[in-house]
Amino acid sequence: MRFGKKSLFALGLALSLGLGAFSGAIAGDNGGHGKSGHGSHWTYEGEGESGPAHWGELSADYAVCSKGQSQSPIDISGAQDQDVADVEFSYEASAINILNNGHTVQVNYDAGSSITVDGADYQLLQFHFHTPSEHTVGGRSFDTELHLVHKNDAGELAVVGVLMARGAQNEAFADIFENLPEHAGAVEKLDADVNADGLLPTDRSSFRYTGSLTTPPCSENVKWIVLKTPIELSDEQVDGLHEILDDNNRPVQPVHTRKVISDTAR
């Protein structure tokens, strides 16, 4: 039996005390993308009282969700070309476990994989999914978005976003999508290792900007690297993920005075 959004949230809430692999704004799920450690009950229920429009009212810890000037996601348009150093990806194969935390399906990753951005190393902690995409490009939404969450030694976050569109079957995700936990609180552990490098497009050109977590507490000063080239998933893969997650995307937020950089990978 598959659970819809409301059922997932209710069950996830009941199990929340038993899920705590981490605590706090960052540790709640290695970057705040999912169930936060603060305990206020937020959802994706549109205009509902716990939905995205009201996250900033649910807790003083979430105030930046409504008051912040550097919130994510955004619609990416008018990006400025800039010659910047490529993001260096140093991913290793990892044993993984897949957690359904009631807000997303999160894949926890072993230590030892990283990216280098602007000369700083960020360790890969986990990746997870949003359906449909959170970022849009020139107003265009995509079927799914993958977020790979990284943290450096200073506790600062960098998130790589991968846009995903319907197309051919993507074998790189086969083991993951065949073992998606359907119930909130459920965990699946894969026997086979997965290398996150194989989940990314070959062309690593990107849009970069400074933003926030896309879930409460919506903490800012997150480095965002949204890869320009979408990857494909089959209808079966997209629909299977959406059947579990329903719509778990925060609406796009105002860009305000931020600059979005467009870089071309060498």
Q: Could you say what each language-model-derived stretch is?
A:
Residues 2-7, 12, 20-266:
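Alpha-carbonic anhydrase
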